[in-house]
Amino acid sequence: AASGFQSVIMAPTELLARQHFDTFVKDLSDHEISPVILISSMKASDKRMAMESISSGKAKVIIATHAVLEENIVFKNLGLVITDEQHRFGVNQRRKLSGKGEGVNILVMTATPIPRTIAAILYGDLDISQIRTMPKGRKGIHTYKCSQGERNRVLNFVEKEMKAGRQAYVVAPLIEDSESIDAKSANAIFDELQDRFNDFNIKLVHGAMKSADKDKIMQDFASGKVNLLVSTTVIEVGINVPNASVMVIENAERFGLAQLHQLRGRVGRGSDDAYCFLMCYTDSEPVSYTHLRAHET
């Protein structure tokens, strides 16, 4: 920005884009740089103002979703493209964004564990950097594999954390009960926990809901209005809640390593100890459990 170039950060969800926007507004306040946000749900008048600011070059830092890929979004002097959670975008989408400038520098980011061989195939033309250290002040995430018989103790621990003022997630592999799949559903767990934790504000979120409804619930959780969030994997990208200290993943044997890693990464973002309980209801241990413990953060 100080050199006159524009930078754009593209995120896969509006919620994540808003969180990035709030962070950049705070971090750049001392540098007299005012970030601009561009998302699909903006009012037409606000979107028009953002587009004018981008095309004139006044906007030096732009945080956006895929809305920035539209043909009528024109940059004056684009110099840097950052793609967050890059695996959620296609190659053509990333190229289209970098093609809005000349000689654009590109940075792609992900916290998803990608094997070296696959990384070499996907990013053979890019330099790969790994951040192996934890952000300052974080204590790490303790990961445990638990059986059906231990579920009550786990839920008691969740209640203890909520009474201490912290927040929790409970993740299920299904939205509704299925006759063909023997697994817990988000709807059933939500009903159960509402009865069990009736002194706390519990909400349900899943992929079949309207985007506006999902975002509202997630924003309420992020602001501390919701104590416990029951969800499907819809939360694996795009929510940052430092006060969330516990995650319970039901039927963890049904998730892969990358999903479990992404889900677990929703907790442990603050200064408190964090806990992830992998609830396994079959005799077979999830292949990913050993890998998660080996990379326990």
What does each of the following model-derived ranges do?
Residues 290-297:
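Conserved small/polar residues in nucleotide/adenosyl-binding loops
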Residues 1-286:
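Inter-lobe coupling/hinge segments of SF2-like helicase ATPases
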